[in-house]
């Protein structure tokens, strides 16, 4: 009798341990799935980030290729408060946004600066002096970019665009006009490439 009770107790314990192990395994799998987020060209981005106490959701990942050689240059990730496929609603959003640019190859600083100047000239053809002064400030904060380095831009309505280079905060470029022009570069009528824009709006990253 005592032996049977002991055996039953042991089996019960084993059942509890097995069940607990299964639950722990499931929780670990779910945690890893959440942590993995989305991937493009071997670069992983989380599904959510926190900016100034606000939870932002990944709207899309876009891939930028070199114009002529068609080699991969960078993957960009756009985080927003409310996801959307409408570029105008994102450009004119009154909520915070974060754009992360993860480079897939080395790029010289002069190439980066020339691209910014061209991009802002497209979205603001009248080129007001105040805007171009702020573009000059942005360019002054940049340097040669190496593979796997990141530029992060945090848009805060009423404040402007905070610029972070490889985790180092460079400063904030003020003005809602600048922040709208900045988002128009990526989502407007003349983006660096149609494929990049499509990806940031929720399409395929390829």
Language-model features, listed with the residues they occupy:
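Mid-length scaffold segments of soluble, non-membrane domains
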Residues: 81-158
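Flexible glycine-rich active-site/ligand-binding loops centered on an Asp-His dyad
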Residues: 170-196
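N-terminal secretory signal peptides that target proteins for export/translocation
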Residues: 1-19
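Cysteine/selenocysteine-centered motifs that mediate thiol-based redox chemistry or coordinate metal-sulfur cofactors
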Residues: 195-206
């Amino acid at each position: 009798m005592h032996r049977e009770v002991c055996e039953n107790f042991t089996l019960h314990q084993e059942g509890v341990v097995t069940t607990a192990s299964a639950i722990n395994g499931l929780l670990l799998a779910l945690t890893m799935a959440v942590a993995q987020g989305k991937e493009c060209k071997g670069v992983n981005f989380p599904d959510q980030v926190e900016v100034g106490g606000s939870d932002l959701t990944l709207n899309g990942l876009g891939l930028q290729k070199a114009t002529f050689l068609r080699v991969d240059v960078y993957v960009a990730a756009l985080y927003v408060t409310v996801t959307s496929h409408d570029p105008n609603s994102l450009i004119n959003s009154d909520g915070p946004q974060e754009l992360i640019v993860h480079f897939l190859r080395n790029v010289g600083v002069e190439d980066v600066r020339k691209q910014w100047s061209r991009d802002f000239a497209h979205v603001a053809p009248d080129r007001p002096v105040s805007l171009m002064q702020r573009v000059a400030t942005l360019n002054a904060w940049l340097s040669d970019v190496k593979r796997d380095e990141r530029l992060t831009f945090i848009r805060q309505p009423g404040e402007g665009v905070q610029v972070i280079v490889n985790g180092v905060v460079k400063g904030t470029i003020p003005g809602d006009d600048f922040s709208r022009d900045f988002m128009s570069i990526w989502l407007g009528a003349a983006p660096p490439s149609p494929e990049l824009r499509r990806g940031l709006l929720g399409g395929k990253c390829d």
